[in-house]
């Protein structure tokens, strides 16, 4: 397993590489109690400041990184969904059952989608980063204003985010299970 300082450098480099490839704000979040904590943030070109900011705790049910963590961390997901879920915009999904259905679609797709649910003018996509134990330990995300991250580009951008997250997972010691 890489040392903690080496892991931090590896994560920072991976987020920067994704930002350079996409030209949009990218970040990496980890679970922190019932929230997602932004550990790495790299601002995109001409995007303006997009949340989450470095060291900011954000809700999981309405952010791309938070949804990716919820989708792949079942026990933690249930702890989060048992709590009251705040509404931040008219698009925020606060229903635990509808969120469970959305998270099942997230797992099937391979990345989460946040469409103006936390801030009314941004969208985000995120994919899980797995550790050597196979648990989703973080989520790598891209967030941008709606005019920069258009819904018809989700598939292409989502694939790029998933590839970056898979590469980071491998660097952190994750070996995907091989189907028999």
Enumerate the language-model features and the residues they cover:
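Generic structural signal for secondary-structure transition and capping sites
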Residues: 23, 74, 85, 108-112, ...
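N-terminal helix-turn-helix
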Residues: 1-9, 159, 166-174
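Flexible, glycine/proline-enriched loop segments at strand-loop-helix junctions
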Residues: 2, 89-91
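Extended hydrophobic
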Residues: 92-165
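Amphipathic alpha-helical effector-binding/dimerization core
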Residues: 1-83
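Cysteine/selenocysteine-centered motifs that mediate thiol-based redox chemistry or coordinate metal-sulfur cofactors
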Residues: 79-87, 162-180
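Solvent-exposed, charged/polar functional surfaces in cytosolic regulatory/catalytic domains
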Residues: 17, 21, 101-105, 167, ...
